[in-house]
Amino acid sequence: MNTELLEKLKKIQLECAKKVIARDDFEKVETIGGMDLTFEKINENPTRAWASLVVVELKTLKPVYQHVVKDIVDFPYIPTFLAFREMPLLLKLYETAKVKPDVYFIDGQGIAHPRGCGIASHFGVETGEVTVGVAKSKLFGYAKEPAPQRGSYTYLKYKGKIIGAVVRTKDNTAPVYVSVGHRISLKTAIDLVLKTSKYRVPEPTRLAHNLLQVVRRKELRR
């Protein structure tokens, strides 16, 4: 990947960051959709990939809809440029889904990104949907470890600015990294993540991940 192209992609991310709405910009939340992707060979390019959406009811956490798409991904894995690898497939998933949840949880970063526009923010700005970034590891910033009890959290910061939260979703279990994607406040994002978490990973993205593992195994046996 040449330097000139990377600079163009950085500019796209910086422009995206300017469009992020980091406040609650919706009326209600009754359903939440989890989105996830998996690759046949993550370090190869091009490679086959699958993306899934599982929609759950907020009150019951029971799944009410699921959808999977597959395609060839033809953009290399480059740290901090994940959106350019995954967005085409996520958009295909979004556009072909028959159910649109009130909020999308995306396995990745929102504004907790060096240029303020990770995959969750990129997807939100592109589609206009309400999105939250829920990642299993930290990409950017610094934070203290939250207390070991479920519901504890600390703020993820960079240069004194809050860019996300480190949230303990289960007692004595590794935290998740929550950040604003688009059209939501960090406070509400944290609240929704905790409301939807039975285990470490919130149910919408956990179920989306589990669905992908089943689909991927079946596909690779063919």
UniProtKB/Swiss-Prot annotation:
One GO CC annotation: cytoplasm
Question: Where exactly is the site Interaction with target DNA?
Answer: Y77
Q: Which InterPro entries match?
A: Endonuclease-V (IPR007581)
Which catalytic reaction applies to this protein?
Answer: Endonucleolytic cleavage at apurinic or apyrimidinic sites to products with a 5'-phosphate
UniProtKB keywords: Cytoplasm, DNA damage, DNA repair, Endonuclease, Hydrolase, Magnesium, Metal-binding, Nuclease
Q: Where in the cell is it found?
A: Cytoplasm
GO BP annotations listed: DNA repair
The UniProt annotation places Mg(2+) binding at D36, D107
Q: Name one GO molecular function term.
A: single-stranded RNA binding
Cofactors: Mg(2+)
Q: Which Pfam families match?
A: Endonuclease_5 (PF04493)
EC annotation?
Answer: 3.1.21.7
Q: Which domain of life is it from?
A: Bacteria
Main subcellular localization, coarse class? cytoplasm
**Biological function:** DNA repair enzyme involved in the repair of deaminated bases. Selectively cleaves double-stranded DNA at the second phosphodiester bond 3' to a deoxyinosine leaving behind the intact lesion on the nicked DNA.
The UniProt entry's sequence similarity note says: Belongs to the endonuclease V family.
What is this protein called in UniProt? Endonuclease V
- GN (gene name): nfi
